[in-house]
Amino acid sequence: MNITKAFCLSIALLGASNMQAITNSDFVIQQDNTKINNYQTNRPEASKRLFVSQAVEQQIAHIKQLLTNVRLAWMFENCFPNTLDTTVHFDGKDDTFVYTGDIHAMWLRDSGAQVWPYVQLANKDAKLKKMLAGVIKRQFKCINIDPYANAF
């Protein structure tokens, strides 16, 4: 018998000799103390949101009606509009900048990925459509400056 097998066998036997019988009385089901009964929005106040889309707000209301899990509905309400609320800088012109985080080398990829969930709603909201076009135009503008760069 090689050393590895002998070692594994001795560990298994040692563990088996120290095992105690487990009975149902060893387990107590406790009430979940992490349950939140009153879910509050974590979104910025409406006046402090960087971009507001009526189509996105309507989509949030629609999805929340479909979800039966209150916590999941709360998470969707807070997460889905987060990019618009906190990272999109659009001043009505054909130029939109999206804050993408700390990896500047991935701006082209991340700026597109962050606004991608809203593309499906673009035809329902002219302002949203213009903002999305602004992201694309900003990307083209940056690529024209340096086609081999990926961070601007």
Q: What residue ranges belong to the model's regions?
A:
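Helix-terminus loop motifs that line ligand-binding clefts
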Residues: K127-F152
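Well-ordered alpha-helical segments within folded domains of soluble proteins
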Residues: W107-Q120, K129-A133
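Classical Sec-dependent N-terminal signal peptides that target proteins to the secretory pathway
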Residues: N2-A21
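Residue-level detector of alpha-helical secondary structure
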Residues: M75-C79, A113, P117, R138
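A generic secondary-structure boundary signal that marks alpha-helix termini
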Residues: D85, N123-K124, K141
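Low-complexity, Ser/Thr/Pro/Gly-enriched N-terminal "stalk/linker" regions
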Residues: I22-R109
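Structural helix-adjacent loops and short alpha-helical linkers that scaffold large soluble proteins
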Residues: Q65-L72, L121-A133
